[in-house]
């Protein structure tokens, strides 16, 4: 099943640098069962057991994390 998820094409995340992407990967993997994958250096997201609302929450969280100071 993991291979099917990895092969699935999804839209790239826009405007995130590597550090922000790593922070999101750690947080989202533990909170929402979302996994960020890289395809040719472009960050991409695929969902495992995640509903459409969780994917929408990921998009809003991405913007929030990008605008936050750590």
Swiss-Prot record:
It comes from the Viruses. Phosphorylated by host PKC. Phosphorylation alters the stability and may also have an impact on the subcellular location. It is found in: Host cytoplasm; Host nucleus. One of its GO terms (cellular component) is host cell cytoplasm. The keyword Phosphoprotein applies. The keyword Phosphoprotein applies. Keywords: Host cytoplasm, Host nucleus, Host-virus interaction, Phosphoprotein. Interacts with VP1. Interacts with Large T antigen. Interacts with small t antigen. Alters the structure of the nuclear envelope. Involved in the perinuclear-nuclear localization of the capsid protein VP1 during virion assembly and maturation. May contribute to viral genome transcription and translation of viral late proteins. Plays an important role in the release of progeny virions from infected cells and in viral propagation. This is Squirrel monkey agnoprotein. The gene is agnogene.
